[in-house]
UniProtKB/Swiss-Prot annotation:
The gene is ak8. It holds the Pfam family ADK. Keywords: ATP-binding, Cytoplasm, Kinase, Nucleotide-binding, Transferase. It comes from the Eukaryota. ATP 2 binds at residues 278-283. One of its GO terms (cellular component) is cytoplasm. AMP 1 binds at residues 140-143, 147, 218. This is Adenylate kinase 8. It comes from Xenopus laevis. Nucleoside monophosphate (NMP) kinase that catalyzes the reversible transfer of the terminal phosphate group between nucleoside triphosphates and monophosphates. Has highest activity toward AMP, and weaker activity toward dAMP, CMP and dCMP. Also displays broad nucleoside diphosphate kinase activity. Residues 177-206 are annotated as: LID 1. ATP 1 binds at residues 67-72. Residues 391-424 are annotated as: LID 2.
Length: 485
């Protein structure tokens, strides 16, 4: 970047690199870990931390009252995310840990394991290789705010806290139907999850503590403790109603666990809108520019401005514009580069529409260093596109635009003088649609993380969807489904 040249151009590669590799978040998390663990050799610790490459592995607490489905959700989540499933019981199953032996001695005496010891146990277990590399889902712990605070003091903090919830009467009815397989400890239910294998049915027994009175006592204890836990983890928690089919519950749990917390990293929006003609790209871009100060870059508009300003490039492309021909890509890219690399665009971000229209143009844009961090496809059926555009007319006197269905002319004399823009004839609209469909799939493959928005609804509803994806981080990518042998 040459500070002596005017106008000042900001190389786009710096911001793209920092955002693509999460440089800000890497440094922030590394400093957090150093301050929490306080290693004797912080330099080597940071090197090891970077080598582990485990900042994005799942770290999940799943809590809930009895019979809320904690075990089922934890198992499904671990299977889908390839994470380690932890419970207080299996944490105490180690036969080599001195801390486990100390905890077992309390249990042998019929005493509660102290919260401080629980925190050390969890810290020890979560420091093992499987939890570090694959992440973990901890079911049913912590149970109290004191335990949660002890975990925090030990440096154990979840990325997500899932709290399962349902009316007490539903939970009591569920709990009374619970059955346990005495051979492997698997949980079944007389109504919702009865095994088909007669051999398994014979192994099922009714667990202790599922009577209505005992379940009610456990529910009271849960309701007494959960407000404190929610206060402790207020920024990473979500309540999910489990009085619905369990796969619907799991879908909500998985969506939440894959979500990312809002980063403190500097974020400059670089937005690409594409879609069929008439999908509302220009309107959405103007709404974004109006609300957030993002620089609105319409490809067709900046080409016309270059011609009107009589720049050197404008003079070169003027014949193409006047004859309604496609401007060569290299000219378009040079003009767009001036806008995309301007100081205002680097400072406030940009929203681009009208370019690229195919993968060749997208590759040119990428080679120039301009990669969007949000790509939206405004989806609209061909019938709706043709209806929107072919019925659109303009009043040559006032310049006002009308539509035969959505905004008819107010008076008959206005209606009689309306004229149609030739590019909105049904034949030309269909030709533009054919060009769009010929390239849409390849463009989506090029950009991969394309966010599809249904554009056949109120434009402000569409804007709210777009806005929600801009102000929040994109969710984590879901790992491949494990294949059965």
């Amino acid at each position: 970047m040459d500070a002596t040249r005017k106008p000042l151009r900001i190389p786009p590669a710096m911001a793209v690199y920092a955002e693509e590799h999460g440089v800000f978040d890497i440094i922030q998390k590394m400093v957090e870990k150093v301050l929490v663990d306080r290693p004797e050799d912080p330099i080597q610790y940071m090197i090891d931390h970077l080598s582990n490459d485990n900042d994005d592995v799942p770290r999940v607490f799943i809590l809930g009252p009895p019979a809320s489905g904690k075990h089922t959700m934890a198992k499904l989540l671990c299977k889908r995310l390839n994470a380690t499933h932890l419970t207080p019981e299996n944490v105490l199953s180690s036969d080599v840990s001195l801390l486990v032996k100390e905890a077992q001695s309390y249990r042998d005496k019929g005493q509660e394991v102290p919260d401080e010891l629980w925190a050390k146990l969890m810290r020890e277990r979560l420091s093992q290789v499987d939890c570090i590399k694959r992440g973990w889902v901890l079911e049913g712990f912590p149970k109290t705010r004191d335990q949660a605070l002890m975990l925090q003091m030990a440096g154990v903090c979840p990325g997500h806290l899932v709290v399962l919830d349902a009316p007490d009467i539903v939970l009591i009815e569920r709990n009374m139907g619970k059955r346990i397989d005495i051979t492997d400890g698997e949980v079944y239910h007389t109504t919702f999850d009865w095994p088909s294998d007669p051999a398994v049915q014979r192994n099922l027994v009714e667990p202790e503590g599922i009577s209505e009175e005992e379940t009610g006592q456990r529910l009271l204890e849960f309701h007494r403790n959960i407000p404190g836990l929610l206060r402790t983890y207020s920024k990473v928690s979500k309540k999910i109603n489990v009085d619905q089919p369990y796969m619907d519950v799991f879908s909500q749990v998985l969506t939440f666990v894959l979500s990312k917390q809002r980063s403190l990293a500097p974020h400059t929006p670089r937005i690409l809108l594409y879609g069929p003609p008439g999908s509302g790209r220009s309107l959405q871009a103007s709404l974004l520019a109006q609300k957030y100060g993002i620089i609105n870059i319409c490809c067709g508009q900046v080409l016309k401005e270059a011609v009107a300003d009589q720049t050197k490039l404008g003079e070169l492309i003027q014949p193409y514009i006047e004859n309604d021909q496609q401007v060569p890509d290299n000219f378009v890219l040079k003009i767009l580069t001036d806008h995309l690399s301007s100081l205002e665009s680097a400072k406030h971000g940009w929203v681009l529409h009208g370019f690229p229209q195919d993968t060749d143009q997208a590759a040119l844009l990428k080679d120039a260093g301009f990669m969007p961090n949000r790509v939206f496809s405004l989806d609209l059926s061909d019938d709706v596109v043709i209806e929107r555009l072919s019925l659109c007319m303009t009043d040559p006197v006032s310049g006002e635009r009308y539509h035969s269905i959505y905004k008819p002319a107010p008076r008959s004399e206005v209606q009689e003088r309306l004229q149609q823009n030739p590019k909105y004839s049904e034949e030309k609209v269909q030709a533009r649609l054919d060009v769009y469909h010929a390239n849409a799939d390849e463009l989506e493959e090029f950009y991969q993380d394309v966010i599809h928005i249904n554009a056949d609804q109120d434009p402000y509803t569409v804007f709210e969807f777009i806005e929600s994806y801009i102000v929040s981080p994109l969710p984590k990518s879901l790992p491949e489904e494990p294949t059965s042998p």
